[in-house]
Amino acid sequence: MASEEIISGMKTKMDKTIDLVKKDFGTVRTGRANPSLVEDIRVDYYGTLTPINQLGNISVPEPRMLVISPYDKGIMKDIEKAIQASGLGLQPSNDGVVIRIIIPELTGERRKELAKIVKSKSEEKKVAIRNIRRDAMEDLKKHTEGLSQDEIKTIQDRIQKTTDSYIDKISALTAEKEKEITTI
């Protein structure tokens, strides 16, 4: 296996981890309406747990309001119950046509809790990035035949620099999300 294959495989896995960070951070409530807050909440739809985003349109008509327009009006009560049971602290209101969710202001205490959650998720993903680096280093050790010590060291340095750049990306996303949470 060539060094380029090891590094490109590592980058692919790390890109997926960055996408997971963005998705995880999207589910953290910030006081602003964002469809990702509710789109993955599962609703019992004819015996199948289905995400809300497959049951209707989610729009943001105002900065602190989400509107869900279900395709099937008969499921509105179930969507409402699923949102209330989600643990996000959201109170949906159903007018028979759409479900409106007003996003309440965050308290200072809740902002601190959310910042801790963001840091925790960030640290989990940094560990995942480091594990990907470890796997790449192990792959390199298995395929060192025909490589000089200098070539091996150069490849190890590239793996480390790539890892550092992805950890920096996670740190930047974390700082951005924390700022979003703590900004009133």
Swiss-Prot record:
It is found in: Cytoplasm. It comes from the Bacteria. Pfam families: RRF (PF01765). The keyword Protein biosynthesis applies. Its main location: cytoplasm. GO terms for molecular function: ribosomal large subunit binding. GO terms for cellular component: cytoplasm. Keywords: Cytoplasm, Protein biosynthesis. GO terms for biological process: translational termination. The keyword Protein biosynthesis applies. PANTHER family: MITOCHONDRIAL RIBOSOME RECYCLING FACTOR PSEUDO 1, RIBOSOME RECYCLING FACTOR. NCBIfam families: frr. Belongs to the RRF family. Responsible for the release of ribosomes from messenger RNA at the termination of protein biosynthesis. May increase the efficiency of translation by recycling ribosomes from one round of translation to another. This is Ribosome-recycling factor. It comes from Leptospira borgpetersenii serovar Hardjo-bovis (strain JB197). The gene is frr.
